[in-house]
Amino acid sequence: MEDRRRPLLTGRWYLLIAAAYLAGLLSLGAGLRHNVGFPLDDSWIHQQMARNLVRYRSFGFTPGVTSSGSSSAFWTFILSINYLLFPAHSPVFFPLIVNAALIVPSGILLWRIAVFDGLPLIYALALALLPALSGNYIWLAFTGMEHVLFATLSLLAILLWFRAGGVLRRGDATGSGNALRTSLLTGLALGALGMTRPEGLALSVLLFALYRWCGRSVSDVLRAAAVAVLFLVPAFVINLKTSGTLLPMTLRGRRFLFGNTDKLHVGWSTVRELTRETYAKVIQHNFFHTASGWAMVGVVLAFYGCFVLLRRFPNRTSLLALWAMLHYASYCFMLPATGHGGRYQPFVLLLFPPLLAIGLFDLIALICRFLLPRTRALLLPAQSMALIAVAALTAATLPRWRVALRDSIYDIDNCHLKMAEYLNEHYPPGTKMGVFDIGTIGYFSHIDLIDLGGLVDRNYLPYLMSGRVPQYLEERGVNYIILAHNGPEGEYDGTGSPTRFGDELHFFRNPALRLEEIHSEGIDYPTWYSSYVYTQHAYRFQTLYRIVYLNQDTAAK
């Protein structure tokens, strides 16, 4: 067994996998030509916090003020390296280089996981190579955010935790020689994972609960947990200081954005909501590019592929499938949404194409074994044809996501950035303004920005949830707001009401105030819509209003 696996762990296989991921990166990277930027406004929130950390020695979105704003403390620290060492360089390329340097190892880790588990070669190829052809997964590397790091650290922790067997180390069949080292390294990976995103803590629970099936001892668990705590405690301290809770306040703000509530809830309604959104947006539209129900066939095959991996339990690939399921389940009650471009569900983006292929492989094997026993010689050619078909289907997503990347960057640069430039030209530094999409405007403008999305100030959330946002702004002397909204087409194209945020924040049809429109920035509908249907990155317009507060007598009249 050892001799059979060893040739699959040589440099030529790693080069093949790396070449596939580099090709995927180059394919989407063409969307950056004359169009450098981030496809999401949230990307600039991380940049603002990293810059503030270096300039003001404070962790927060508001310069010089300790506050919330990011759900990933570890990613903020990584981005701050750019401002510490290369402050004059573009903030776009540093996270792209980091994510590119992480997404290639994610494929190599998948390959090693499959090889160590003894999966058939064609299964290993599907698991390692197909994500490189997924435009949606490769797109994560261009967001400037932490999701590729999260996926790669997860794969690393799973691989390390199962290294106790030492299958390739001669003369050490029990793995006792490297058990200490790999348990410490696993703790390091798990700690960094929990500091990258709070739901990463669940992988620690899963690995430690299954330690016996992974060939580990209680001592290994204690060592790994002790190392992980070194990372998790600082993350919890930061959250307590900025949000008043162990979890970042951004989760509550995002729950309001996607569900109009900040409460945790688990039930059939949240499971149904997340499942329906995952199927309609991530699978049916973003992967298959169809509105037809035939996409459900792919979902069924992927579920069957997941079952194929789980029936091999205990091994690394089955644990990866369990972790993907646990991660998805955590979002059913923590934040029942797929996020912009499916970014909250990186394992769906990573594993859907391979699971689809593995499901096909197993069905073909069953047919050859039981229904057509005389065709066993055709098993590998048939599985190879299935792999080519799934690869072609997956690769077709690359050009679509290149267009989505290009157009969403164009929207952020020609709407949000243009608004920031307008503010710098027409208002003195320190002018107080309430803003909903805070990333780009907060990074590039010199205004005193007041967050309206519930991501920064924990004292704001009670006002947001009780419909008293105008009162919050009036108490702080804020006379301007910038609201994101769609054009009139939002009523019929399913992208959202033009007055959604104005209504939810109680600025429209409010007898206690009047809004006077000052300036608006936006882009053409076709360009905006071509990216929005894939990423839901931002509304089409950013409009600046003056708030005229009315006295009680005037409001009563």
Task: Describe these PLM feature segments.
Residues 3-557:
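Membrane-proximal envelope and lipid/glycan-remodeling enzymes
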